[in-house]
Design a protein with these regions (language model features):
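Intrinsic-disorder-associated, low-complexity terminal segments enriched in Asp/Asn/His/Tyr and depleted
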Residues: 13, 19-22
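Substrate/ligand-engaging "lid" and interaction regions
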Residues: 21-572
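Low-complexity, intrinsically disordered or signal/transmembrane-proximal segments
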Residues: 8, 13-14
Length: 572
């Protein structure tokens, strides 16, 4: 009898243990080595390296600092570091810095032990999940006038000779110092006046950190922008030098510091081209992770309107082309697929993507998608008119003037984008996300191609049809009224108030009104488009296209259909 009870107890225990294993929810902070099998049950690959050792090595002699801890960094840069560490080609991690949102550091990085799970969403519906523990430390460095603890921590890091690279993914507006009228933003103006002691703006912060490095021995390093716009390294350098020269004029730094920043044996600003569509965390991915047994599946919406999570979802295709100019050495980026090359090749690859083969198409879908009521990019490219539009822009107007960078094929790039990447329903990108900061993107997306048509004696910008149509549709977007005549919530844009203010009094439902006075300030603004659209012969065409879309409900769609029917080229 006692033996039977003993057997019963054992059976009950085994059943209990099996049930516990079947219902186990793995946490991102769990010991991924000890509980590797549980992560595997959730479909999550884990690293082989010891996070504590990597953190110790990093803090003792930092090698790589990254500014901008958002979803792109978590999906791409952190992956590169993790893979290099796992392969034994790097023994230090990344120190990540956020200057925008303290909640990202406290509520995501610190909370989850500086780890993240990257989910690659494939077109067949499958997912590749991988945990990264390559971030050694996460620092919030907001305005030092409010809290200088992050600034002081970074100064100690920047004085160490081991530091090789500071990389950036802070979006294009993160480098901007001036408003549309050419005036310094208020925090920048205060920084110029007050000097490097307690910087408010993130570019001022960067210069103050470089000053600390200069004063500690003037050791070399590279500042690598990996943001998605043309000549990103040059823009970073321009912003850094603008602050530095203003501080020299005000007596805060000397000429030796200026010389240090301009000596390419000391400080460099490599160019890069980056491409990986990384939208906000997806509810679909969140639910899949929950179902798989991953406990930290929740999406976090911070008070500063950042959407982030313990996971990040991204597409399978990815490209990073970098100018190989690192005066203090660098991690072996090429061993994880980064194309390291010369400046001219980066420029060509960047122009191919940013000005021709991806971003102009993306922005067109963002503008049209928002005012036509689409909620996903993938659903837009199922719409025959919108797919036809981006093919006309990409193959018909951009491809003829883009130079081949050789390391990537422009035509194959567009083919992959139009036929595989954009239609992927499991890559949950939205036109509303892509429409963010559109005013900062129009010059790169469309102005560069227009300039190519100006520069080529065998071409005429007046022969362009669909790029002007997209610009006209953007004017229509700036009214804040969709194709059904209802107001919509625009995506964040630093120039929205100004630009919307110029067109808000245009009457919806009247295609005969004179719009010139309302739109001329926008279309002639070289800081937006890179060219004066009237001077190059496109202003009147854009105005005419815009007026067609004012006639009433449905006229945005009707105007698009009419132009496609009349002006399309054979691009198959």
């Amino acid at each position: 009898m006692l033996e039977w009870k003993r057997v019963q107890v054992i059976l009950i225990y085994q059943l209990f243990r099996k049930n516990m294993e079947d219902t186990f929810m793995v946490k991102i902070t769990d010991d991924y080595k000890a509980k590797k099998e549980y992560f595997a049950k959730a479909g999550i690959k884990v690293p082989t390296y010891d996070q504590a050792e990597i953190t110790k090595n990093t803090l003792a002699a930092p090698q790589w600092v990254h500014f901008g801890g958002g979803n792109l960094f978590r999906a791409f840069h952190a992956a590169i570091a993790s893979h290099l560490i796992d392969a034994g080609k790097l023994n230090k991690g990344i120190i990540v810095v956020d200057t925008h949102d303290s909640s990202v550091i406290s509520g995501v990085y610190n909370k989850f032990n500086n780890r993240m799970v990257r989910v690659i969403t494939k077109a067949d519906g499958s997912q590749d999940r991988e945990l990264f523990a390559s971030v050694a430390k996460a620092i919030y460095a907001g305005p030092a006038t409010e809290d200088d603890s992050g600034f002081e921590a970074l100064k100690k890091i920047f004085t160490q000779d081991s530091l090789q690279v500071a990389s950036f993914s802070i979006t294009e507006k993160g480098y901007a110092l001036k408003d549309a009228e050419g005036n310094f933003y208020a925090p920048v103006a205060r920084d110029i006046k007050n000097g490097p002691a307690k910087p408010e703006n993130n570019m001022s912060l960067m210069v103050a950190l470089l000053l600390a490095r200069f004063n500690a021995g003037a050791n070399p390093m590279a500042l690598l922008s990996t943001d998605n716009f043309s000549q990103n390294g040059d823009k970073l350098k321009d912003s850094v030098m603008t602050i530095a020269k203003a501080w020299k004029a005000n007596g805060f730094v000397n000429q030796d510091f200026i010389d240090y920043l301009t000596d390419e044996n000391k400080i460099t600003f490599p160019l890069s081209m980056i491409d990986r569509i990384t939208p906000n965390p997806s509810e679909t991915v969140s639910k899949a992770l929950e179902k798989a047994g991953f406990e930290d599946y929740q999406i976090i919406h911070t008070p500063a309107h950042t959407n982030i999570a313990a996971f990040t979802n991204t597409e399978e295709a990815h490209y990073l082309v970098v100018e190989d100019k690192f005066p203090n050495g660098r991690p072996a980026f090429e061993d994880d697929g980064v194309i390291m090359t010369d400046r001219d090749t980066v420029n060509l690859a960047d122009q191919m993507k940013v000005t021709a083969c991806l971003n102009p198409l993306h922005t067109a879908l963002a503008i049209y998608g928002t005012i036509l009521g689409f909620k996903s990019i993938s659903s837009e490219v199922q719409d025959p008119d919108l797919k036809h539009l981006i093919m006309q822009i990409g193959y018909g107007e951009d491809l003829p003037v883009v130079q081949d960078p050789k390391v990537l094929s422009p035509r194959k790039f567009i083919d992959e984008l139009v036929n595989k990447r954009l239609p992927n329903p499991y890559s949950p990108d939205t036109p509303q996300r892509i429409a963010t900061d559109t005013s900062q993107k129009m010059g790169a997306r469309y102005g560069v191609t227009i300039q190519h048509y100006i520069d080529d004696p065998d071409r005429d910008p007046k022969d362009l049809n669909f790029i002007p149509l997209v610009i006209a549709t953007w004017l229509r977007y700036l009214m804040g009224v969709n194709d059904e005549g209802a107001e919509f919530q625009p995506s964040p844009d630093p120039l929205w108030d100004d630009l919307h203010g110029q067109v808000k009094d245009i009457k919806f439902g009247d295609a005969d009104q004179d719009v010139h006075e309302a739109v001329k300030g926008i279309l002639s603004n070289k800081s937006i488009f890179g060219v004066d659209l009237y001077e190059v012969g496109l202003g009147s065409k854009i105005e005419a296209d815009f007026k067609e879309m004012l006639a009433g409900k449905g006229t945005i769609r009707k105007t698009l259909e009419a132009h496609l029917a009349k002006e399309s080229k054979d691009v198959e």
